[in-house]
């Protein structure tokens, strides 16, 4: 809905609670709520948004940036958005529109959790050659504990 820092942090907190932990690294696109200047101090040492940097320290994760114009990193995110739109959002709108139901955030979240469980996490993912639900069982072990609120 917006590109404000407080929205970004709220989304992170919700995601960390959903996953029951904090990843050691979080990969970002080069948006201003994350990075103020790439390679500010030297190659690979960026000047991050101070609020994000502090939040990362509090939660225990390190921010990492996609390299600009590099499909191997940014393209993965863009493909995920396209997959979600084509496999979840458009079919959901197509099903609900004839019933006069608008796809708002609450409706999308409710249906989205079911779609993640029944569809997205059950298929074999091309990049990792595994089902996301199976990979999650392995990766869950490396998550950091949520700090107390």
Regions found by a protein language model. Name each.
Residues 2, 42-50, 78:
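Short, conserved loop/turn and helix-capping segments at secondary-structure boundaries
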């Amino acid at each position: 809905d917006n590109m404000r820092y407080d929205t970004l942090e709220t989304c992170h907190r919700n995601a960390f609670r959903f996953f029951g932990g904090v990843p050691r690294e979080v990969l970002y696109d080069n948006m201003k709520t994350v990075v103020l200047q790439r390679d500010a101090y030297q190659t690979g040492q960026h000047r991050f948004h101070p609020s994000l940097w502090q939040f990362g320290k509090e939660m225990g994760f390190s921010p990492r940036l996609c390299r600009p114009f590099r499909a191997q990193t940014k393209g993965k995110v863009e493909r995920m958005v396209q997959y979600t739109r084509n496999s979840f959002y458009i079919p959901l709108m197509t099903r609900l529109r004839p019933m006069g139901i608008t796809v708002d955030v609450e409706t999308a979240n409710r249906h989205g959790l079911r779609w993640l469980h029944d569809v997205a996490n059950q298929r074999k993912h091309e990049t990792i050659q595994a089902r996301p639900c199976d990979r999650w069982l392995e990766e869950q072990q490396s998550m950091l504990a949520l700090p107390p609120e």
